[in-house]
Amino acid sequence: MVSLKIQKRLAASVMKCGKGKVWLDPNESGDISMANSRQNIRKLVKDGFIIRKPTKIHSRSRARALNEAKRKGRHSGYGKRKGTREARLPTKILWMRRMRVLRRFLSKYRESKKIDRHMYHDMYMKVKGNVFKNKRVLMESIHKMKAEKAREKTLADQFEAKRIKNKASRERKFARREERLAQGPGGGETTTPAGAPQQPEVTKKKSKK
């Protein structure tokens, strides 16, 4: 049996694959053994005496089905677990994921002008302090705080309007009082028309007893 190691190596180099992928025609071993250059190997490849084997297909359908089932929670009982809970999913990773989700949510709300920078900072510090369990709780807290601020603003506006109204009422009352004081205790001086005769003053005599 003629050794075809050199021809297989040259064919692998020409076809840019591994030596395991090279198929040499056993019926043409004599012609193949005479090929000692890359040019001769290319000619044999063109003639079909040397062939590159097709890639073996390793089906992943079973692996995909298993991964889909694991996403649904199957195959994850006590008998399938290896390692402690902390080793399987560290609490630090869970914390980082939650922080990133909540902070991204706050940034999106701030950019869309749904919250101002003061509320953003307040909520950011609460997120850091582990106040909110998930995004839904954070959203409810934001809506509640906005409703509370709106209610406080409405009450403040009502109080300010009432204060202005009372102030105006006091000013009107004070103006009327000043006007009455300016007119005098008799309700104002009575003026006699020019040219009218003045009535003499009548003095009452005291009777002696």
Swiss-Prot record:
Cellular component annotations (GO), alphabetically ordered: cytosol; cytosolic large ribosomal subunit
Ribosomal protein found in the keyword field: yes
InterPro entries assigned to the protein according to its UniProt record, in alphabetical order: 60S_ribosomal_eL19_sf, Ribosomal_eL19, Ribosomal_eL19_CS, Ribosomal_eL19_dom, Ribosomal_eL19_dom1, Ribosomal_eL19_euk
Listed Basic and acidic residues bias regions: 161-181
Gene field: RPL19B
Coiled coil: none
GO biological-process terms attached to the record: translation
Alphabetic keyword roster: Ribonucleoprotein, Ribosomal protein
Region (Disordered): 60-84, 161-209
Sample GO molecular function, one term: mRNA binding
Protein name: Large ribosomal subunit protein eL19z
Gene3D superfamilies: 1.10.1200.240, 1.10.1650.10
Biased composition (Basic residues): 71-83
Family: Belongs to the eukaryotic ribosomal protein eL19 family.
